[in-house]
């Protein structure tokens, strides 16, 4: 079956690239930051991501009968929970998919500038650039493409329901998961710059006290958003 090339343009800030390869009697879960550099192999399926939780979710979905797209979408939504610096639903990305028949599908779901954006939105009345407005303000963010991209892939090439593939992400956001060294380091690095944003400090610390390795990080608000997307699709987010 020859499938059309998909292009759904969005444009700016956070990038995730998903590459899937068609047919893949062992399953492998790989975190790209694993302590070992030993090569991993899989003959039925393999998921590689920044998060062991996300990779495990992808394998779980494929073992339950889902195809590679179902697994990738599950992985993507879990990354929104376990890898907030780059896997979040506030960003965008690209997907390159090689199907079992050899055909290739691509999807560009990068962020898009808001419809009310103008060419001088970062300038003052004298035409000078306002420092920080394009990098550290609400005007710095584009309209996220991640949710649209993942749901488009699932609707066009997946086999499972949103509820099924999003269940691992919703569970991890609500119940929480233990923080690893890398996430704790990231949180501590950005916490000082969040001082002007109390809501961000609340989300990424314990009343201003940095998290430590092994602490359980729960995100109830994110769980609510993911549940809404699961029930309503695009309309639950945009």
What is the role of each PLM region?
Residues 16-31:
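Bacterial N-terminal signal peptides
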Residues 1-14:
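N-terminal secretory signal peptides that target proteins for export/translocation
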Residues 14-17, 51:
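Hydrophobic alpha-helical segments, especially transmembrane helices
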Residues 35-56, 60, 68-238:
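Noncatalytic scaffold domains of N-terminal-nucleophile
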């Amino acid at each position: 079956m020859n499938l059309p090339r998909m292009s759904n343009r969005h444009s700016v800030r956070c990038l995730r690239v998903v590459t899937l390869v068609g047919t893949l009697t062992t399953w492998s879960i790989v975190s790209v930051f694993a302590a070992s550099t030993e090569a991993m192999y899989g003959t039925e399926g393999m998921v590689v991501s920044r998060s062991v939780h996300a990779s495990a979710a992808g394998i779980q979905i494929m073992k339950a009968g889902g195809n590679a797209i179902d697994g990738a979408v599950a992985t993507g939504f879990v990354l929104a929970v376990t890898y907030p610096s780059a896997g979040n639903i506030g960003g965008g990305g690209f997907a390159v998919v090689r199907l079992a028949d050899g055909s290739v599908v691509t999807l560009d779901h990068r962020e898009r500038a808001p419809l009310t954006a103008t060419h001088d939105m970062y300038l003052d009345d004298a035409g000078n650039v306002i420092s920080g407005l394009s990098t550290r303000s609400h005007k710095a963010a584009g309209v996220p493409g991640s949710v649209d991209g993942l749901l488009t892939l699932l609707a066009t090439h997946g086999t499972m329901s949103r509820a099924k593939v999003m269940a691992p992400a919703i569970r991890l956001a609500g119940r929480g998961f233990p923080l690893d060294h890398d996430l704790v380091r990231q949180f501590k690095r950005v916490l000082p710059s969040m001082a002007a944003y109390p809501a961000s400090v609340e989300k990424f610390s314990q009343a201003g006290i940095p998290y430590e390795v092994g602490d359980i990080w729960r995100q109830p608000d994110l769980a609510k958003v993911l549940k809404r997307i699961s029930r309503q699709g695009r309309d639950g987010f945009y």
